């Protein structure tokens, strides 16, 4: 059966019911809790990476911001593992859905903004009007700063969606070209296959980098409001 180019981005269903919730929960099964006092090398490596990432992200925060440590680490683990599992053939990547990414970005952004208005009301309101602004520019700047504030979660979600979707589409196109060239020009097919392997390795890096960038931007929004 011939598949559409965007088939892998459609929400999978069973008997007409969406199973995206099960797919989203699946990565948590991949990280079982160790039942031994001494961890193996894989668990030790995971813990080292988490400690390194948390140290980099939380070093700029005060005590109020550091209470979000568990949330930020859970977020980067979830997005990273979901992106990596989406690289498996014929699999579904939830982070290619803009609705899901908005569902993550908007509550996290709203939480940081609410925290800022609650604990730093004057400083949060001061962001809407830079110091030394001419009087005739005040209405325009307030509108611009308000729009830039509300566009933050949209930019956060669109960035993740666009990067993951673009990589998957490029892999799909190069893979299709490789299959089409196998009977026409084996040498060219071999070259495109090597390019596909290199692109796949790059996509593994992109999957982790995008998870880090998404979480880092949430951390910066939190820092601006605490």
Curated annotation (Swiss-Prot):
Q: Give the UniProt keywords, A-Z.
A: ATP synthesis, CF(0), Hydrogen ion transport, Ion transport, Membrane, Mitochondrion, Mitochondrion inner membrane, Transmembrane, Transmembrane helix, Transport
Where found? Mitochondrion inner membrane
GO cellular component terms, alphabetically, are: mitochondrial inner membrane; proton-transporting ATP synthase complex
Task: Give one GO biological process term.
Answer: proton motive force-driven ATP synthesis
Its quaternary organisation is: Component of the ATP synthase complex composed at least of ATP5F1A/subunit alpha, ATP5F1B/subunit beta, ATP5MC1/subunit c (homooctomer), MT-ATP6/subunit a, MT-ATP8/subunit 8, ATP5ME/subunit e, ATP5MF/subunit f, ATP5MG/subunit g, ATP5MK/subunit k, ATP5MJ/subunit j, ATP5F1C/subunit gamma, ATP5F1D/subunit delta, ATP5F1E/subunit epsilon, ATP5PF/subunit F6, ATP5PB/subunit b, ATP5PD/subunit d, ATP5PO/subunit OSCP.
The species this protein belongs to is Ceratotherium simum
| Catalytic function, reaction form | H(+)(in) = H(+)(out)
What exactly does this protein do? Subunit a, of the mitochondrial membrane ATP synthase complex (F(1)F(0) ATP synthase or Complex V) that produces ATP from ADP in the presence of a proton gradient across the membrane which is generated by electron transport complexes of the respiratory chain. ATP synthase complex consist of a soluble F(1) head domain - the catalytic core - and a membrane F(1) domain - the membrane proton channel. These two domains are linked by a central stalk rotating inside the F(1) region and a stationary peripheral stalk.
Q: Which InterPro entries does this one have? A: ATP_synth_F0_asu (IPR000568), ATP_synth_F0_asu_AS (IPR023011), ATP_synth_F0_asu_bact/mt (IPR045083), F0_ATP_A_sf (IPR035908)
Q: Would you say which domain of life the source belongs to?
A: Eukaryota
Q: Name the chain's protein.
A: ATP synthase F(0) complex subunit a
Pfam families reported for this sequence: ATP-synt_A
């Amino acid at each position: 059966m011939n598949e559409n180019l965007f088939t892998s981005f459609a929400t999978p269903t069973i008997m007409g019911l969406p199973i995206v919730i099960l797919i989203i929960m699946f990565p948590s099964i991949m990280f079982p809790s160790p039942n031994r006092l001494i961890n193996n090398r894989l668990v030790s490596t995971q813990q080292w990476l988490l400690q390194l990432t948390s140290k980099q992200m939380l070093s700029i925060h005060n005590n109020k911001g550091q209470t979000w440590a568990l949330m930020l680490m859970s977020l980067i683990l979830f997005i990273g593992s979901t992106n990596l599992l989406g690289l498996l053939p014929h699999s579904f990547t939830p982070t290619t859905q803009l609705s899901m990414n908005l569902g993550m970005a908007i509550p996290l952004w709203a939480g940081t903004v609410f925290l800022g208005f609650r604990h730093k009301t004057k400083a949060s309101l001061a962001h809407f009007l830079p110091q030394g602004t001419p009087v005739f520019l005040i209405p325009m700047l307030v509108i611009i700063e308000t729009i830039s504030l509300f566009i933050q979660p949209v930019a956060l979600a669109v960035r993740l969606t666009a990067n993951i979707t673009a990589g998957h589409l490029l892999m799909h196109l190069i893979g299709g070209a490789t299959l089409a060239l196998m009977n026409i020009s084996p040498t060219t097919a071999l070259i495109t296959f090597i390019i596909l392997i290199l692109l796949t390795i790059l996509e593994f890096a992109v999957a982790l980098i995008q998870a880090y960038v998404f979480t880092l931007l949430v951390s910066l929004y939190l820092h601006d409001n605490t």
